[in-house]
Amino acid sequence: MTAKRIDGKAFAAGVRARVAEEVARLKEGHGIVPGLAVVLVGEDPASQVYVGAKGKQTVEVGMASFEHRLPAGTSEAELLALIDRLNHDPAVHGILVQLPLPAHLNADLVINALDPAKDVDGFHISNVGRLGTGQKSMVPCTPLGCLMMLRDHLGALSGLNAVVVGRSNIVGKPMAQLLLGESCTVTIAHSRTRDLAAVCRGADILVAAVGRPEMITGDFVKPGATVIDVGINRIERDGKTKLVGDVDYASAAEVAGAITPVPGGVGPMTIACLLANTLTACCRANGLPEPQGLTA
């Protein structure tokens, strides 16, 4: 068996196209332009590239992009004052604070200063709690992207056994909550789970988000299972730096029914879902129906 390759890059392009259509409808029908504000503190090169990509794609779908690039020495009071202004700015429907923040800033304090309705990363404690209790919330972008791809590939997920390897607040825990919301039977595993391979082999859906390069090999995979690889790891191989996931693609693809590659799998969905969340936040703020299929 050779697994179907789930093309996250193509799927993300489809999500962005759908968002662009809905943005155009908002402009034509209601005179509303969704706005996304991104806040970057410091000069971290990877964060600068990521913020630039977010701004570019925001504009491409017809939204307003507001970038706030602050020096690394910005005080907590200054950052919180900016967030307060953005919270009260009617042109801004989504706010994202690029992480990680410099060490002198309290990330939890900053994230929880956001208006939960504008927290398009879904990290505010209110959104975390609402997701956990099955209420309408802003859903973290990476798990939302995984769910979209699973729905597209498998259709109804009800009754399937799902194993999420990883328990982070950003991916593992919200992914498990989303799968519970789809009526899956969910197991959260991690690096200390006893006989992890046996646990994973019981999964119809296997989500790897443990942060260990190529940890999940083919003998962890149930024949025909759908494998979603959230990991992004840089390793040295043959004198070159290579990007790999948490799944050993070559061996897992021989067993799985479908699998996401790294790169080109889950990664492109993160920004696409950020745009989808901004659209959702805009619709909610204006009392308009939310577009179907772009949120949980």
Swiss-Prot record:
Keywords on record: Amino-acid biosynthesis, Histidine biosynthesis, Hydrolase, Methionine biosynthesis, Multifunctional enzyme, NADP, One-carbon metabolism, Oxidoreductase, Purine biosynthesis
The protein's annotated pathway: One-carbon metabolism; tetrahydrofolate interconversion
Catalytic activity, reaction form: (6R)-5,10-methylene-5,6,7,8-tetrahydrofolate + NADP(+) = (6R)-5,10-methenyltetrahydrofolate + NADPH; (6R)-5,10-methenyltetrahydrofolate + H2O = (6R)-10-formyltetrahydrofolate + H(+)
Chain residues that bind NADP(+): 166-168, 191, 232
Cellular component aspect of the GO annotation: cytosol
GO biological process, one term: L-histidine biosynthetic process
Function per UniProt: Catalyzes the oxidation of 5,10-methylenetetrahydrofolate to 5,10-methenyltetrahydrofolate and then the hydrolysis of 5,10-methenyltetrahydrofolate to 10-formyltetrahydrofolate.
Designated name of the protein: Bifunctional protein FolD
